[in-house]
């Protein structure tokens, strides 16, 4: 990670950390770096989610892009993966999404996609950071016909919706409950599943700029669990603020997380001979039960650090076509270059329809070990240093020795928030609580948190 860029672009509290001034510079410098080798006038797509700060940051970012001669196509409110899809399929120089994904409304973020539809690599981010830190802005300042042109492009959303529908199968009145998190999916999910022929119940579809992810969406699926049971839906589908994640709910109201979604899709593709190298790419956060289920089915796995960018890097490097995270990022490389909650949802309902199995039947093949995750809020400067504190390292080693291989512990700094994450898995809930509570007590004592 760099000074400005984390694992998923530039993020911070809007108007305090992620200011309009910084957004302008990111537009100006990012646009320049991503378009300097273009032979024709560069074109950049810009999308945003529903946060109240989105239009403020969009205006500043767009001004920066226009100031270096880039033509900007404003997409409005739509999913992050829609930006990636449109960049790749419409020959744009780059794309930019203004969103902080699953974070609360006070935060926002800016992430870039290259002309290939993939998130930027470390080298490109370093180039942008060097310009941000330069003492003087020496980039060209064209005038008159040299300036960029601003175009509203609502057709982009319709094209994305049509594409996702084309990857699915008719649902013939299947009862589907949607939770669009008062976020980006609120402009598209209803239309996509209506076009597929689903009978819909929708919540989290009334964004007001402040309620994105607020007690709804993939990080708060409790409301959807109740709606699924009350409406008699066959499946519930919860997206996060920018719709790059999916958490599902089965017909009984039980959660089907990213691990189970990856398993269901992976097994389906494997049986059809369509799972590249018969391998799923996952992260260190995936549950032991997921790994055991893959072993039973003879499906291989490749394991990366936490963060969908690392999953994508491994997929591109080795030619895999399915990967993701327990949190609900699922990358289906045959269809898109990044995690796409609505695409995953379309594929999941297609598998249910084609196999004739309920979601609970499909998900029951993975037995999830009890897992507990505690987030300890720390300053960003401390979250990396905490991992080197001798007492913290010692208690982690001690707990791992006690597990004797029947479980696991993971302590890591968040790549996107000022948090230290402590996670444990074990055969029983009592053991999990013991391991996590013991470690968090030591962490809090060592870094001075009561």
Curated annotation (Swiss-Prot):
One of its GO terms (molecular function) is phosphoglucosamine mutase activity. Coiled coil: none annotated. InterPro entries: A-D-PHexomutase_a/b/a-I, A-D-PHexomutase_a/b/a-I/II/III, A-D-PHexomutase_a/b/a-II, A-D-PHexomutase_a/b/a-III, A-D-PHexomutase_C, A-D-PHexomutase_C_sf, A-D-PHexomutase_CS, Alpha-D-phosphohexomutase_SF. It catalyses: alpha-D-glucosamine 1-phosphate = D-glucosamine 6-phosphate. One of its GO terms (cellular component) is cytosol. Catalyzes the conversion of glucosamine-6-phosphate to glucosamine-1-phosphate. The modification Phosphoserine is found at residue 101. This is Phosphoglucosamine mutase. One of its GO terms (biological process) is carbohydrate metabolic process. The active site is at residue 101. It is an enzyme of class 5 (isomerase). Its cofactor is Mg(2+). The gene is glmM. Activated by phosphorylation. Belongs to the phosphohexose mutase family. SUPFAM superfamilies: Phosphoglucomutase, C-terminal domain, Phosphoglucomutase, first 3 domains. Keywords: Isomerase, Magnesium, Metal-binding, Phosphoprotein. Binds 1 Mg(2+) ion per subunit. Its EC number is 5.4.2.10. Pfam families: PGM_PMM_I, PGM_PMM_II, PGM_PMM_III, PGM_PMM_IV. It comes from Streptococcus pneumoniae serotype 4 (strain ATCC BAA-334 / TIGR4). Mg(2+) binds at residues 101, 240, 242, 244.
